[in-house]
């Protein structure tokens, strides 16, 4: 797959030591589950109330404003954030295309994502949420492949996966139809739940029925991961 090969090629390129050191930054995996908000990374920006992968809502001044966000059914409050783009600017100044690609935008394993922390009433980060970001056209049709990288990180074994029923009007994308929910327990009782979708919804088609021209982005391809402590 194009994106997988591109990621592998990017990882094979190493930045000059000085640049690599300068570009170290936090990402979603840097969140410390079970730790208070005061101990979380400070190099994230644009905190806001999250919407499960949708656009951010109420702007926040930082982690400390989390109680302005409405609690979910679990009682946790979702706080959206994005990665600081300073590292991207440094990479551009050093004329390092591989590092620009690596540090451009909020990504994991090369996939654009929407990320958030799930915070309890006592200001402890109890979980994280990662959702594919559909706003980026490049390789959007391969967003579902992120599942493979997540299972490699968390462990490929002991996932209980359920194929969800096809709803009326849903169809495959170039012969591929995925609508799945997977879950597993990690050390310490942390629960990982992942939803994977790659399909066309009712009304979406590869070709416009009136003009016969190929449509653009008329499909859904995404991964959502919730990683939550008990």
Language-model region placement:
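Positively charged n-region of N-terminal signal peptides that target proteins for export
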Residues: 1-4
């Amino acid at each position: 797959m194009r994106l997988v090969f591109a990621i592998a090629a990017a990882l094979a390129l190493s930045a000059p030591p000085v640049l690599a050191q300068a570009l170290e930054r936090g990402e979603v995996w840097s969140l410390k589950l079970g730790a208070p908000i005061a101990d979380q990374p400070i190099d994230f920006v644009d905190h806001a109330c999250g919407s499960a992968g949708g656009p951010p809502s109420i702007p926040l001044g930082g982690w400390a404003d989390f109680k302005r966000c409405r609690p979910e059914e679990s009682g946790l409050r979702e706080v959206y954030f994005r990665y600081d783009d300073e590292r991207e600017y440094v990479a551009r100044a050093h004329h390092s295309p591989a590092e620009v690609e690596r540090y451009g935008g909020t990504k994991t394993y090369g996939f654009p994502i929407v990320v958030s922390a799930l915070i309890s009433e006592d200001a402890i980060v109890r979980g994280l949420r990662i959702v594919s970001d559909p706003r980026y056209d490049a390789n959007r049709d391969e967003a579902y492949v992120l599942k493979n990288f997540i299972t490699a990180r968390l462990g490929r074994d002991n996932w209980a996966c359920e194929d969800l029923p096809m709803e009326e009007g849903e169809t495959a994308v170039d012969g591929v139809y995925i609508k799945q929910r997977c879950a597993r327990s990690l050390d310490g009782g942390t629960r990982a739940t992942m939803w994977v979708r790659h399909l066309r919804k009712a009304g979406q088609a590869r070709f416009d029925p009136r003009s016969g021209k190929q449509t653009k982005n008329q499909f859904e391809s995404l991964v959502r991961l919730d990683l939550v402590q008990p």
